[in-house]
Amino acid sequence: MTVRIAINGFGRIGRNVVRALYESGRRAEITVVAINELADAAGMAHLLKYDTSHGRFAWEVRHEREQLFVGDDVIRILHERTLADLPWRELGVDVVLDCTGVYGNREHGEAHIAAGAKKVLFSHPGSNGLDATVVFGVNQNELRAEHRIVSNASCTTNCIIPVIKLLDDAYGIESGTVTTIHSAMNDQQVIDAYHSDLRRTRAASQSIIPVDTKLAAGITRIFPQFNDRFEAIAVRVPTINVTAIDLSVTVKKPVKASEVNQLLQKAAQGAFHGIVDYTESPLVSIDFNHDPHSAIVDGTQTRVSGAHLIKTLVWCDNEWGFANRMLDTTLAMAAVGFRLDASASTKL
């Protein structure tokens, strides 16, 4: 069965989802039938074809009126501001990928379903009222047909959760701290300008800027046993893509750095192949641009202090890796079937 998807919001993640779909060769599994975006069709086509971070798109892209052509495929363009007005029923949409970054609660998901979609996948952390939050590679096998409104968590959650799981399963995590070193985002300023967050009033290209993060909450959403045992901070740095995460955990069992690396490398080659990668090459952030993995462990930076404090550095392409996980989760949601009885919903 080919899953019919619609994309709501054609920004960084929405466009990368389309690119990843075509580059990964999954067009027999997923078809994009519509994109809803307030910007005009000319701008949508141009930014899909030309991308500063990911280069030129290999497929021919053009637009005519309210249609986007990618190769021989035709995608309907919509410019609806109100979710209730979206023609998902008419278009036979199986899953809506909501990539706006604005919508994320159950009410928004129900609006997509009322418009005719069978399921909804948010490209960002949602409220506690959603049916499930999925980190692909860790808990997607817990999805059920009645899970209709789902979050794909965040790029940083997808990056760090597999590593936390591996370390906890092997050594037993007591507590941890996380520092996210994240590329600049489009909620920052090119030059100094007003923003409700005074730090984000400052030019993104000129400073390392601390920002709020809910990553600790994202960790405990997947692993409730770590409630009040993880803390996280985040800074934005003057690069336009790729993120590094500094993870420090205290563990119950004594361990050496070489053993940690052996564990993570084995997982990358085995159970977490395609999700986690491992490297000991002397690489920098640009080298991970366009990497489809959720997490790339930098083995050269693993440290252990006092046999119980582990520090690791984990990289990710916060756009490309996450866009690929959106596709993975979409297929996982479709694979368990579509149960339309909302009263049967159970939470994951």
UniProtKB/Swiss-Prot annotation:
One of its GO terms (cellular component) is cytoplasm. It catalyses: D-erythrose 4-phosphate + NAD(+) + H2O = 4-phospho-D-erythronate + NADH + 2 H(+). It comes from the Bacteria. The lineage of its organism: Bacteria, Pseudomonadati, Pseudomonadota, Gammaproteobacteria, Enterobacterales. Its EC number is 1.2.1.72. Signal peptide: none annotated. This is D-erythrose-4-phosphate dehydrogenase. Pathway: Cofactor biosynthesis; pyridoxine 5'-phosphate biosynthesis; pyridoxine 5'-phosphate from D-erythrose 4-phosphate: step 1/5. It holds the Pfam family Gp_dh_C. Substrate binds at S154, C155, T156, R200, T213, K214, R236. Catalyzes the NAD-dependent conversion of D-erythrose 4-phosphate to 4-phosphoerythronate. The record marks H182 as: Activates thiol group during catalysis. Gene3D superfamilies: Dihydrodipicolinate Reductase, domain 2, NAD(P)-binding Rossmann-like Domain. The active site is at C155 (nucleophile). SMART domains: Gp_dh_N. It is found in: Cytoplasm. Homotetramer. InterPro entries: E4P_DH_bac, GlycerAld/Erythrose_P_DH, GlycerAld_3-P_DH_AS, GlycerAld_3-P_DH_cat, GlycerAld_3-P_DH_NAD(P)-bd, Glyceraldehyde-3-P_DH_1, NAD(P)-bd_dom_sf. GO terms for biological process: glucose metabolic process; pyridoxal phosphate biosynthetic process; pyridoxine biosynthetic process. It comes from Salmonella gallinarum (strain 287/91 / NCTC 13346). Keywords: Cytoplasm, NAD, Oxidoreductase, Pyridoxine biosynthesis. PANTHER family: GLYCERALDEHYDE-3-PHOSPHATE DEHYDROGENASE 2. Belongs to the glyceraldehyde-3-phosphate dehydrogenase family. Epd subfamily. NCBIfam families: E4PD_g-proteo, GAPDH-I, PRK13535.1. GO terms for molecular function: erythrose-4-phosphate dehydrogenase activity; NAD binding; NADP binding.
